[in-house]
Amino acid sequence: MSEAARPEKTKTERRLEKSVELNASPEQIWSALTDPKQLVQWFPLVARVTPGLGGKFFLSWGPDYEGEGEIISWEPGKRFGWKEPLGTIEFIIEARGGKTILRLVQSAFLSGEDWENEWFESTSYGWGFMLLSLHWMLERHPGADRQIRWPRQKTSLSREEAYARVFSAGAIFEIDARSLAAGTTYSLRTTTGESWSGTVEFAKPLRGICLSIRQLNDALLWFTIEGTPGKIDAQIWLSAWGVEESRLDAIHDKLAIRLRETLA
């Protein structure tokens, strides 16, 4: 059968929903979602917004990680959403008992390809970190500028092998990071000479781990393993507010070297 005659695979809707309770007003959250100056303090590296229904919403983490969508929901203080190639993303804002509930709803129409399944799982996992970053920006670092350091390394290793190498004792940490449990406190040393303590914000086997770091003014450090077999991408996101750039640069350079050596 020729490619032209091949029947198109049936696509089905996959939907993910997440919510977070925030000590912020609906107006503050609306600004965090729609003001480019606010967006870059918790979400992308670059943001551009053309306000209003039918406007454009552009997000970028660099040339390989960027996109633009059409705004499909624009109700100030209540609802904001945009359309992407695979589906839609909407945020619903609801004031409740002096706090605000922010609900994320993302739907995508997928045909079941391996890369689509991986994209959906990575997206669901990634939103956990992004919503945590929003919480950190609004409640712990209001008005502060975020600094991002983002070493990453591609590898042909399997996900299981990459995860085992990155999180085993002697790679990035001096302990086996696979033993860290979400919601617990930790105190450890890295193989780059840093002494860190804080809370394990979340952890997921074969995906990664997120730590808060007291020694970096309550920064967030997120390790994530993404990609399909043979095309694994190991990434370290360091989000810090109010920390000297030179200090973050030094940490980035050391982590990048260790990540490269670990996955070689």
Residue ranges and their predicted role:
Residues S2-K9:
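A detector for short, charged/polar N-terminal pre-domain segments
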